[in-house]
Amino acid sequence: MNKTKMDSKVLDSILMKMLKTVDGSKDEVFQIGEQSRQQYEQLVEELKQIKQQVYEVIELGDKLEVQTRHARNRLSEVSRNFHRFSEEEIRNAYEKAHKLQVELTMIQQREKQLRERRDDLERRLLGLQEIIERSESLVSQITVVLNYLNQDLREVGLLLADAQAKQDFGLRIIEAQEEERKRVSREIHDGPAQMLANVMMRSELIERIFRDRGAEDGFQEIKNLRQNVRNALYEVRRIIYDLRPMALDDLGLIPTLRKYLYTTEEYNGKVKIHFQCIGETEDQRLAPQFEVALFRLAQEAVSNALKHSESEEITVKVEITKDFVILMIKDNGKGFDLKEAKEKKNKSFGLLGMKERVDLLEGTMTIDSKIGLGTFIMIKVPLSL
C-alpha cells in the first residue's frame, strides 16, 4: 500500500515537472512570436517609408535626367561655338553640366540603395511571417498537450468503455476549444486590434497635420479617426455576439437567428442570405438546450459556406412541428466530395463537430454536396429529448 502511494507521488512529481517544462516552452515560443510580430509591424512601417522614398527619388531622378540632358546640350552648343561665348559662360555651362551629372549619379545610387533595402525588408517580412505562423501553431499544439495532461478525464472514462474512444473524445474537445480560442484571437487581432493600432498611429499625426496643413485638414482627420473607432466598436460587438448572442436568452431562436443572418449578410456584403421560418410565431420558445444547439448548428453551417463554398447565395430554413425541429441550410457554391471529406477528418472538423452536436440531441444530419452544384444540409431534431 505504502509502495503504491510512493509510486503515485513519484508519478505526480514527474508529471508536474513535465508540465512545468512544457509550460515554460510554451511561454518561450509565445515570446518569440510576440517579438517577431513587433519586429514585423516595425518593418512594415519602415517598408512603407522606404517605398515612399523610392517614389520620391525616382521622381527627382527623372527631373534631374531632364535637367542634365539640357545642360549637356547647352555645353555641347557652347563647345561647338566657343568663339561666340565668353570664358565665364563656357565655365558656367561646364560647371552646371558637371554638377547636375554628379547629382544625378548620387540620386541613382540612392535609388539603388533604397531598392535593395526595400527588397531586403520584403524578404525579412516573409521570414518573420513564417516564424509568427509557426509560433502560433506551436503554442496552439503545446496548449492542447497541456490541457490534455491537466484535464481529468476519469468521469468521462466511466461513460466511455473503449480507451481509444476516450482519448479521441478528450482530444477532440480540447482541439475544439483551442480552435475557438484561435478563431477569437485571430478575429480580435485582425479586427479591433489592427483598427486601434491604426487609430493610435493616426492620432500621432494629428498635431503635425494641424501644424503643416491647417485646422480644416486636422478636423477632417479627427472625423476619420472617430469613424475608425466606431468600426472597431462594431467589430468588438460582432465578436461578442458570435461568442454568445444575448438576444438568444431574451428573444429566442427565431428572432436571434434572423438578426444574426441579417448582420452576417451586411458584414460580408457579397453574399445574399435568405431566411425562412415555417410553423412558428415570432415569440415561440423552445427549451434552452435546443435553442443554443440549433443556433450554433446554423451558425457553423453558414460560417462553413462563407469560408469554403465561394457561394453567392445561402438559404436558411427552419421548420417547427409538434415533434421535430428541422433546420435546412443550402448554398450555391462550389460544393465538395463527401467521400474525400470523410477520409480527411482533420479538414472536415466543422462538419464533425456539427454531427456530434446533432447526436447529443438524438437527431439526424444529412449532407448532400456535389462539386460545382453547392451543398445542402438538413438537420432533424426531436423535441421529446
UniProtKB/Swiss-Prot annotation:
InterPro entries reported for this sequence: DegS, HATPase_C_sf, His_kinase_dom, Sensor_HK_TwoCompSys, Sig_transdc_His_kin_sub3_dim/P, Sig_transdc_His_kinase_DegS
Pfam families tied to this protein: DegS, HATPase_c, HisKA_3
SUPFAM superfamilies from the UniProt entry: ATPase domain of HSP90 chaperone/DNA topoisomerase II/histidine kinase
GO CC, alphabetical: cytoplasm; plasma membrane
Molecular function via GO: ATP binding; phosphoprotein phosphatase activity; phosphorelay sensor kinase activity; protein dimerization activity; protein kinase activity
Catalytic activity: ATP + protein L-histidine = ADP + protein N-phospho-L-histidine
Keywords, comma-separated and alphabetical: ATP-binding, Coiled coil, Cytoplasm, Hydrolase, Kinase, Nucleotide-binding, Phosphoprotein, Protein phosphatase, Transferase, Two-component regulatory system
Chain segments annotated as coiled-coil in the UniProt record: 31-141
UniProt keyword Transmembrane helix, yes or no: no
SMART domains named among the record's database cross-references: HATPase_c (SM00387)
Post-translational modification summary for this protein: Autophosphorylated. Phosphorylated in vitro at Ser-76 by the serine/threonine-protein kinase YbdM, which stimulates the phosphate transfer to DegU.
Domain Histidine kinase: from-to ranges: 183-385
UniProt effect for mutating S76D: Shows increased phosphorylation, as well as increased autophosphorylation and phosphotransfer to DegU. Negatively affects competence development
PANTHER family linked to this entry: NITRATE/NITRITE SENSOR PROTEIN NARX-RELATED, SENSOR HISTIDINE KINASE YDFH
Protein name according to UniProt: Signal transduction histidine-protein kinase/phosphatase DegS
